[in-house]
Amino acid sequence: MAFMSMERSTWAFTFGILGNLISLMVFLSPLPTFYRVYRKKSTEGFQSTPYVVTLFSCMLWMYYAFVKSGAELLVTINGVGCVIETVYLAMYLAYAPKSARMLTAKMLLGLNIGLFGVIALVTLLLSRGELRVHVLGWICVAVSLSVFAAPLSIIRLVIRTKSVEFMPFSLSFFLVLSAVIWFLYGLLKKDVFVALPNVLGFVFGVAQMALYMAYRSKKPLVASSSSAAVAAGLETKLPEHVKEVQAVAKGAVAAAPEGRISCGAEVHPIDDVMPSEVVEVKVDDEETNRTDEMAGDGDHAMVRTEQIIKPDMAIVVEV
């Protein structure tokens, strides 16, 4: 019996070390995403929710490991996870739009400070010994299930856009591997709170990998540069004066019989444009810059989005 117990302990320690290494890979798998965020100085529609929830989960598991004896391997990996997730969130807050920063800050205050503080206070004051371990264990199980379910929004996004841009394969692969290793660790340690949530983690990880294989060769429904905006349900809004210019252009083109209007100006197709004969109007969020380039005998008009007819002048509206 003593030999079997020692062998079980050895295997548990081995799987614990493997779990630490693989979980570290899981924590580091979003690095390409955040390198891209750093390089482009934009979060490009990526959400912070999975990272906030993961940080909260690491904090709770560290607390659980401190309360439960013989769980040092849980302390090490979750401590490292807290540091890594904090770095990710700091980068997100640095480059996200104001609305996303505010939402992330509210989640951090409410979840990682508020709720964690309440849980710590209640378990310290109202429970002791094994009861405290069990209360914390079930809380950790519930939060871990939330962490594994957090990518559901990404799965929905992949199905809608038919693009795997927002779901790295490496993350899904390491989630499956991590779930298997930690399940075996919990089984050998007879810790149901560690083993149970990793069953669902394995299922979600396999689902993500299957989705990646299904959509990796499909053409996205939206262009890569605009997929984030489409995914977020955003719509490009033009200034009112640009809309008025577009309306005038449409009316002028529609009213011109056989390519001419009464004032003598001609309506030319976009293909007939001469680049050297342009008056360009670039529309900015705050100001309008005009660049005039006049050359040649005729006065032609080139319009990128719409054509505007005006005597003796050609106008380009670039939106």
Curated annotation (Swiss-Prot):
Domain of life the protein comes from: Eukaryota
Coiled-coil region: none
GO cellular component: plasma membrane
PANTHER family: BIDIRECTIONAL SUGAR TRANSPORTER SWEET15, RAG1-ACTIVATING PROTEIN 1
InterPro entries assigned: SWEET, SWEET_rpt
Topology, Cytoplasmic side: 32-50, 94-106, 156-167, 213-319
Membrane-spanning parts: 11-31, 51-71, 73-93, 107-127, 135-155, 168-188, 192-212
Gene3D superfamilies reported in the protein's UniProt record: 1.20.1280.290
Extracellular topological domain residue ranges: 1-10, 72, 128-134, 189-191
Entry similarity comment: Belongs to the SWEET sugar transporter family.
Alphabetical keyword list: Cell membrane, Membrane, Repeat, Sugar transport, Transmembrane, Transmembrane helix, Transport
Pfam family, one: MtN3_slv
GO molecular function, one term: sugar transmembrane transporter activity
Function in brief: Mediates both low-affinity uptake and efflux of sugar across the plasma membrane.
Membrane topology of this protein: Multi-pass membrane protein
Principal subcellular localisation of the protein: membrane
Lineage of origin: Eukaryota, Viridiplantae, Streptophyta, Embryophyta, Tracheophyta
Name by which UniProt lists this protein: Bidirectional sugar transporter SWEET15
Subunit field text: Forms homooligomers and/or heterooligomers.
Taxonomic source organism: Oryza sativa subsp. indica
Location(s), subcellular: Cell membrane
Domain MtN3/slv positions: 13-99, 135-219
Record has Endoplasmic reticulum as a keyword: no
